[in-house]
Amino acid sequence: MDLPIQDSHDSSTSPKGKQPTTAEKSATKKEDKVPVKKQKTRTVFSSTQLCVLNDRFQRQKYLSLQQMQELSNILNLSYKQVKTWFQNQRMKSKRWQKNNWLKNSNGVTQGCLVNPTGNLPMWSNQTWNNSTWSNQTQNIQSWSNHSWNTQTWCTQSWNNQAWNSPFYNCGEESLQSCMQFQPNSPASDLQAALEAAGEGLNVIQQTTRYFNTPQTMDLFLNYSMNMQPEDV
């Protein structure tokens, strides 16, 4: 009789399941060995302790070992607690100073740059400069106009005075007196009148030549330039 053949179970289809590999075993061991981080306990300071610590930090930011021990004994704190508090305060102070420095530097940079409207910054008072310059220009122009008008007026008045002077009138009167002689006047009287008229004309010509010289005109112009507005 033939014996029945028993089927051999394949390892892949066996009901026992897969065996874990060495890599998986090592990974599970590492996960088991990961330590759990302990949360640091924060020290809660009382108001009195904070007041003393802040006052000491304002006066002295770095304490020696002996000073920290003395302060910790006074406040009933540990040396480590006092040291940690001072370290944290120094970091906060540096961060605060850095932020203020950045704000101040940004404000100065924005003040130096031109704003979007196209106007200049406030510290550059362009309007004041323009108004001052225009006022100075107007004063110069008004003074120059006043000087020129003074020269013109004085020259015209002087010319009028020169031509209307008694010498000129004297010559005219002499000529008019000559013209008014009657035909029956003696020859001696006519000759005397002509001589008098000639002397008057000579005086007028000499006076006109004197006032027409460059030295006299320069002297007169300098005098008119130095005259104050009140003198005109």
From Swiss-Prot:
The keyword Transcription applies. It is found in: Nucleus. Pfam families: Homeodomain. GO terms for biological process: cell differentiation; regulation of transcription by RNA polymerase II; stem cell population maintenance. The keyword ATP-binding does not apply. It comes from the Eukaryota. One of its GO terms (cellular component) is nucleus. InterPro entries: Distal-less_Homeobox_TF, HD, Homeobox_CS, Homeodomain-like_sf. Residues 1-39 are annotated as: Disordered. Residues 168-232 are annotated as: Sufficient for strong transactivation activity. Residues 11-25 have a biased composition (Polar residues). Residues 123-167 are annotated as: Sufficient for transactivation activity. Residues 123-167 are annotated as: 8 X repeats starting with a Trp in each unit. Keywords: DNA-binding, Homeobox, Nucleus, Repeat, Transcription, Transcription regulation. Residues 26-35 have a biased composition (Basic and acidic residues). Its main location: nucleus. GO terms for molecular function: DNA-binding transcription factor activity, RNA polymerase II-specific; RNA polymerase II cis-regulatory region sequence-specific DNA binding. Sequence repeats lie at residues 123-127, 128-132, 133-137, 143-147, 148-152, 153-157, 158-162, 163-167. Gene3D superfamilies: Homeodomain-like (1.10.10.60). Probable transcriptional regulator. Belongs to the Nanog homeobox family. This is Putative homeobox protein NANOG2.
